[in-house]
Amino acid sequence: MEFWFSELHSPHVKFDIRVEKQLFSGESDYQRIDVFQSPEFGKFLTLNGSVIFSEQDCFIYNEMVVHVPMSVHPDVKNVLIIGGGDGGVSKELLQYDNIENIDIVEQDNMFVDVCREYFPETASGLEDERVHIYNSDALRFLRSKQDMYDLIINDATDPFGASEGLFTREFYGNCYKALKEDGILVYQHGSPFYDEDEDACRSMHRKVFHTFPISRVYQAHIPTSPSGYWLFGFASKKYHPLKDFKPAEWKRRNIHTEYYTTNLHTGAFMLPKYVEELLEQEEER
């Protein structure tokens, strides 16, 4: 008998992954966590029935939220990751010698423990002495921070449930205050392909656009994401992701990647027409 994991991407679209076995299932104070073994995507983790990452394609997401801002900002030293309890984002950041401190705010201890047990290679990004994990509510954590971080990466999963407060105007305003005068915020922007997800994308862009002087959106192909098409947001007080992009300087760092390139960086900001129109409509509101 074959076993399949199924996730509804819309009322009319279902995403299925054949499963060899279930490795873990548990309920934390915040969410249900499951880990599966599959022949196509390797091990993959789900929260409340939605795929969060897999061994096969997690490198795409991690590289795109890290190397895009790191190739623009000339001297990132202090980083805040909101979420990030799997260690994938911090692992990418740790390739940069100039980074002195990485704060990870992850309120779900069970999520961190599960990732350490079942995804040790990814979770190795939690073990460096530059990394500090805070078991705290991110919104509350941010309220006390001002002019502190060069880069904030919002790695929260979605604008619902336990992460709902991380997609509000108050949250983005607190990010603005917590960033230094030349700081950058990067966040996952979701996918606008299905009607059910479009409203969240619109709302997110509207809030960030009216909070930061520079706000752009870029894209990547992530197979396990809804529709396979995923957007990211880049917001900054000073740096533009293309005008201040320094490809030659980034290449001299000899950073290892499997997805990100300096050519891809430029192309990632060239959005399809329907996405451009959606974003422009929110900028005019």
UniProtKB/Swiss-Prot annotation:
Q: Where does S-methyl-5'-thioadenosine bind?
A: Q31, E106, D137, A138
Catalytic residue positions: D155 (proton acceptor)
Q: Which Pfam families does the record associate with it? A: Spermine_synt_N, Spermine_synth
Q: Give the record's pathway.
A: Amine and polyamine biosynthesis; spermidine biosynthesis; spermidine from putrescine: step 1/1
Q: Which InterPro entries match?
A: PABS, SAM-dependent_MTases_sf, Spermi_synthase, Spermidine_synt_N, Spermidine_synt_N_sf
Judging by the UniProt lineage, the source's domain of life is Bacteria
- Annotated GO MF terms: spermidine synthase activity
Q: Where does the record say this protein resides?
A: Cytoplasm
Q: Which residues form the signal peptide?
A: none
Query: Sorted alphabetically, which keywords does the UniProt record give?
Result: Cytoplasm, Polyamine biosynthesis, Spermidine biosynthesis, Transferase
Provide one Gene Ontology cellular component: cytosol
Q: Does the keyword Cytoplasm apply?
A: yes
BP-aspect Gene Ontology terms:
spermidine biosynthetic process
Cysteine disulfide links: none
Q: What EC number(s) does the entry state? A: 2.5.1.16
Domain (PABS) spans: 2-237
| Annotated CDD domains | AdoMet_MTases
Q: What is its main location?
A: cytoplasm
Concerning its family, UniProt says: Belongs to the spermidine/spermine synthase family.
Record's subunit section: Homodimer or homotetramer.
Fetch the NCBIfam families from UniProt.
Answer: MFS_SpdSyn (NF037959), PRK00811.1 (NF002010), speE (TIGR00417)
Name the job this protein performs. Catalyzes the irreversible transfer of a propylamine group from the amino donor S-adenosylmethioninamine (decarboxy-AdoMet) to putrescine (1,4-diaminobutane) to yield spermidine.
Identification of the protein by name: Polyamine aminopropyltransferase
